[in-house]
Amino acid sequence: MIKKLLIYFVRFYQYTLSPLLGLTCRFYPTCSEYMILALQKHGAMKGAYLGVKRICRCHPWNPGGHDPVPESTILSKEKSVK
């Protein structure tokens, strides 16, 4: 439930405020898309943490570039066991 609400707020930002601000994100995927992917992959708590951490790195002194959402640690452990 919280995850869906957070995704709704990010989508609201993407459709209302983001077009007014222009392309300012230094990363791919953009910070807002990263937040949605992190929420979908990791849930509300860890996804929000990863998203906020990413937004804090998005500033003029960071070179940016490709920065994918990390894989879930549970899935990584399951893959390494098999």
UniProtKB/Swiss-Prot annotation:
Keywords: Cell inner membrane, Cell membrane, Membrane. GO terms for cellular component: plasma membrane. The keyword Transit peptide does not apply. It is a peripheral membrane protein. InterPro entries: Membr_insert_effic_factor_YidD. SMART domains: Haemolytic. Residues 63-82 are annotated as: Disordered. It comes from the Bacteria. It is found in: Cell inner membrane. NCBIfam families: membrane protein insertion efficiency factor YidD. Belongs to the UPF0161 family. Could be involved in insertion of integral membrane proteins into the membrane. This is Putative membrane protein insertion efficiency factor. The lineage of its organism: Bacteria, Pseudomonadati, Chlamydiota, Chlamydiia, Parachlamydiales.
